[in-house]
Amino acid sequence: MVMGLSVVFVCIVCCLFTGLFMMLSEKRGLDREKCSPYECGFEPIGSARSPFSIRFFLVAVLFVVFDVEVVLLMPFAYMFFYGKSVLGILSSSGFLLILFVGLYHEYREGSLEWVG
């Protein structure tokens, strides 16, 4: 009980000090140097803000999401090899169903079409 209260007390004190320091700190405006892009110490040549394809960004995000989900499927393969429990099979089937529903939604939305 004492340990739990001490952790809560330390968190409250940290939050109070953080708020106090934020209120008392000096506010500085952004100058031109802070807003300019940094290019290895050299003066920037041209604009660093090049146009970026939103379609490519969406495909990259989808790749990362589905790649992480494939990594989350690895324990299910281990479970199928060493232990065959009904709960494990149902949970992995539910996870795969959610994966395929998400993939179907992205397909129907048109996010997987590169040209369109």
UniProtKB/Swiss-Prot annotation:
EC number(s) of the enzyme? Answer: 7.1.1.2
Instruction: Extract the InterPro entries matched here.
Output: NADH_UbQ/plastoQ_OxRdtase_su3 (IPR000440), NDAH_ubi_oxred_su3_sf (IPR038430)
Q: Where in the cell is it found?
A: Mitochondrion membrane
So where does this one cross the membrane?
Answer: 1-21, 56-76, 85-105
Keywords from UniProt, A to Z, are: Electron transport, Membrane, Mitochondrion, NAD, Respiratory chain, Translocase, Transmembrane, Transmembrane helix, Transport, Ubiquinone
Its placement in the membrane is given as:
Multi-pass membrane protein
Look at the named UniProt entry and state the broad enzyme category this protein falls under. Answer: translocase
Give yes or no: UniProt keyword Chloroplast. Answer: no
Pfam families in alphabetical order: Oxidored_q4
Q: Which reaction does it catalyse?
A: a ubiquinone + NADH + 5 H(+)(in) = a ubiquinol + NAD(+) + 4 H(+)(out)
Please give the Gene Ontology molecular function terms for this protein. NADH dehydrogenase (ubiquinone) activity
Q: Quick check: keyword Manganese in the entry? A: no
A GO CC annotation recorded here is: NADH dehydrogenase complex
- Function, in words: Core subunit of the mitochondrial membrane respiratory chain NADH dehydrogenase (Complex I) that is believed to belong to the minimal assembly required for catalysis. Complex I functions in the transfer of electrons from NADH to the respiratory chain. The immediate electron acceptor for the enzyme is believed to be ubiquinone.
The text of the family note is: Belongs to the complex I subunit 3 family.
What name has this protein been given in UniProt?
NADH-ubiquinone oxidoreductase chain 3
